[in-house]
Amino acid sequence: MFAIIETGGKQYKVKEHDIIRIEKLNASVGEEVTLSKVIALTGVNNEVIFTQNASVTASVLEQCRNDKVIIFKKKRRKNYRRKNGHRQYMTVLRITKINNME
């Protein structure tokens, strides 16, 4: 059984005991988090169910930062060069339970 959840403007396909990296959530390490925006999940015979009341419970493993992305701007023949870096804050979650409340 898997679920498709949405958080941080992105969609993730998750199963129980999966580890995912998502955009930063305001939660401390070890805390349980409930993700209530479930788009779809599968039933007994792997049929897709679209439900409004489902939720996914996850525990926070760590708060970290993603790899650095380099931004480089240049205008030719004008000696204009700008180099900048960015590291996005991430939250690592372990999916503990998929709640199907039909």
From Swiss-Prot:
Oligomeric form and interacting partners: Part of the 50S ribosomal subunit. Contacts protein L20.
Family under the similarity heading: Belongs to the bacterial ribosomal protein bL21 family.
SUPFAM superfamilies in the record: L21p-like
Membrane-spanning intervals of the chain: none
Gene Ontology biological-process annotations: translation
Organism encoding this protein: Ehrlichia ruminantium (strain Welgevonden)
HAMAP family: Ribosomal_bL21 (MF_01363)
Alphabetical list of InterPro entries matching this protein: bL21-like, bL21-like_sf, Ribosomal_bL21, Ribosomal_bL21_CS
Protein name: Large ribosomal subunit protein bL21
Domain of life: Bacteria
One Pfam family matching this protein: Ribosomal_L21p
Record-level GO cellular component terms: cytoplasm; ribonucleoprotein complex; ribosome
Molecular function in Gene Ontology: rRNA binding; structural constituent of ribosome
